Amino acid sequence: MKRASIIMIVGSLCLLGLFAFPLWNIMLGAPQYPDPLGMNIHITGIQGVSEFDLQNIDGLNHYIGMKTIPKADEMWEFNVFPIVIIAMVILGLLLGGLGFIGKIDHRYFLGWFVLMSVLGIMGMYDFNLWLTDYGSNLDPHAIIKVINEDGTPMTYKPPLFGYKKLLNFDVSSMPATGAWLMFIGMTLTLVAFFIGWKSKQSSSSDTNHKPATP
C-alpha cells in the first residue's frame, strides 16, 4: 500500500503542471500567414503562441463580427479553475499521506480519480459552450457576412478537438502540455488504485493460506 500511496502523491503533483504549461492550444493557418496564428489556453488566462497572435486574431475576428478574445478577468473560469486544481492536489496529497500510514485504503484513490474525471468533463463541457458562443454569437453589423447555402449566417466555432476548415483557415484544437501532464497524473492515480487493490488481494490470500497454529 505504501508504493500505491507514493504513486498517488506523484500523480496528484502532476496537476501542478497546469500552472506552468497551457491546457489547450488552438492554431489557425492560412496561405497569407506563413507562420500560423495561435492561442494557448491556460487555467489562468489566454496567451498568444507568438507575441502579436492575439492582436492579429482579434483583428481578423473583427471583420466577421466575432468577439475579442476575453481577458482573464472577463471569465469566471480563470478564477475558479486554479482553485479547483489546488484543492484536488491538496486532496490527493492528503489521501496519499493517509494511505501511506495505513489510515485509508485504495478505494479512496479511485474516488479521487472519479471526482477529477467528473470535474474534467464539466470543464470540457464549459469550454465547448464558450467556443460555441465565441464562434456563433456574431455582431449583426459585421463588415463581412458569409451566408451558408441554406441562407443562414455562417458561424465560426473552432473545433473542441481536432481539425476544421473555416473559410480559408485550417483550424486545429488540441490538448497542450498541461493537459497531458494532467492525464498522466490521473492515470497514475488509477494505477495507484490497482496496485493498492492487488496488494490487498495478496495480503488476504496470504492470510487465508497461513497455517493454523497448534
Please tell me what each predicted stretch does.
Residues K2-I6, L91-M122, T189-P214:
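Juxtamembrane interface at the cytosolic side of transmembrane helices
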Residues R3-L28:
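N-terminal signal-anchor transmembrane alpha helix
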Residues A20-F78, N128-S173:
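Long, glycine/tryptophan/cysteine-rich extracytoplasmic
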Residues L119-L131:
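Juxtamembrane membrane-interface segments at transmembrane alpha-helix termini
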